[in-house]
Amino acid sequence: GETLPYRTRSSELCYAPEQLDAGAFRDAFALCFSSACLLDSPARLTHLKAIAAARDVGTFVCYAPRMTESAPFWPDAASLRETARAFFPQADVLLLKSSDLFPLFGSHELRTALFALFSGHVQLIFYSDSENIHLFTRSVLLSAAKNDLTEAELLYRLCRLNTWPDKLAGLRESTLRKLLF
């Protein structure tokens, strides 16, 4: 394929929106994606179509920016940051690591980022650092000592609690505790 200065063209970047079967989301619980394939390519447009299709059938849209992991695929940090931040409002759930903060906001302080993170559809933020796991809604903050809870386990627990995107805004602290423990 064509060699770009920052990435060799690969099949996932060439996946065009018209190739997406929107019906595949009917039985899905969540659509999860990262910044790695959001380059200026057909794949970015395919992600937008997938997000719309998932939203149409009530499927969770989960975005994990993964700035450190995605950086090698991007031509520069500024375009990665701009694109990653532009996709925040598309997600119902943001899955963040402490390593995402500085590349996104120029600070390691989560407090400086929270206001910007709760935009658009975002109703729940799962944030992990080396010591703790935090769950945020627009009205509740809950923290716990680091345990074995992974992002996949969080989504599984949301599913088991029969929690769908339209219910996220009303999550109470007691429900968040069930997700963490």
Question: What function would you assign to each model-found segment?
Answer:
Residues E2-L142, D148, L155-F181:
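Ribokinase/PfkB-type carbohydrate-kinase core domain
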